[in-house]
């Protein structure tokens, strides 16, 4: 209920997109989006767990154009060092989920916040994308491939012009890779300022850094920019 009120308040103050972090299966998405116009506001659900049964409860949300689910099993492996369950079980559930939500989501922000340079971020992200495309290449029909939405979560730092170039390069690289597998060549990019250069003790410095980072995200062509709290 608190999250819903915060989201509605943010929308009333001008927010055009909302990102919900879903920590477990007890969270009701229907209650989260009460009083929110899902036709005009983009909604992102970042699931911190893997459950095909949970996703299937919300079939009325799944096919809406501006609603995105973030489920990234390789990203979870990179972050925690473990699968949710096992390699085989995770891929089986992931396949069911992707067939339902029509979305592949890849988290590049993990690599940026871990200290990877821009070339490494793009390389690791494309490598991860290639793993997913290779897995689904034989299981999805051509028409289904074209309907899949591709979502990239990206963090940007203070290297202004290079961050702009990174986002533009990401679209070019994805286009090249997707063409090889026959997938949708358009991608949706969500950008969040990096946490790597932020301090607990000087919020004014944080504000200056996030300002330039968000500006580079806008000029780089991000679809959604989610700033960090002041």
Question: PLM features: what roles do these ranges have?
Answer:
Residues 14, 174, 220:
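Conserved, mostly hydrophobic/aromatic
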Residues 11, 217-218:
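Non-catalytic positions within long, well-ordered alpha-helices that form the structural scaffold/packing
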Residues 102, 187, 220:
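Acidic-glycine-rich active-site phosphate/pyrophosphate-binding loop
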Residues 212, 221-230:
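Active-site or pore-adjacent capping/gating segments
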Residues 123-197, 205:
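Gly/Pro-rich turn-and-neighbor structural signature
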Residues 201-214:
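Active-site-adjacent loop and "lid" segments of alpha/beta metabolic enzymes
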Residues 1-156, 224-228:
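Catalytic alpha/beta active-site cores
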């Amino acid at each position: 209920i608190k999250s819903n009120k915060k989201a509605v308040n943010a929308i009333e103050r001008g927010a055009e997109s909302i990102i919900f972090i879903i920590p477990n299966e007890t969270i009701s998405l229907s209650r989260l989006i009460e009083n929110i116009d899902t036709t005009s506001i983009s909604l992102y659900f970042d699931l911190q767990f893997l459950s095909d049964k949970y996703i299937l409860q919300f079939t009325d949300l799944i096919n809406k154009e501006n609603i995105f689910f973030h489920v990234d099993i390789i990203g979870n492996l990179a972050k925690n060092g473990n699968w949710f369950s096992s390699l085989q079980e995770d891929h089986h559930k992931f396949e069911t989920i992707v067939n339902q939500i029509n979305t592949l989501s890849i988290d590049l922000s993990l690599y940026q916040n871990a200290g990877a340079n821009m070339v490494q971020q793009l390389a690791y992200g494309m490598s991860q994308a290639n793993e997913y495309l290779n897995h689904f290449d034989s299981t999805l029909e051509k028409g289904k491939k074209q309907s899949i939405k591709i979502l990239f979560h990206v963090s940007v730092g203070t290297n202004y012009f290079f961050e702009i170039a990174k986002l533009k390069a990401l679209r070019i690289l994805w286009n090249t890779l997707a063409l090889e597998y026959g997938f949708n060549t358009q991608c949706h990019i969500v950008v969040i300022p990096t946490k790597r250069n932020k301090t607990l003790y000087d919020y004014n410095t944080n504000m200056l850094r996030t300002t330039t980072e968000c500006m580079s995200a806008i000029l780089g062509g991000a679809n959604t920019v989610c700033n960090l709290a002041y």
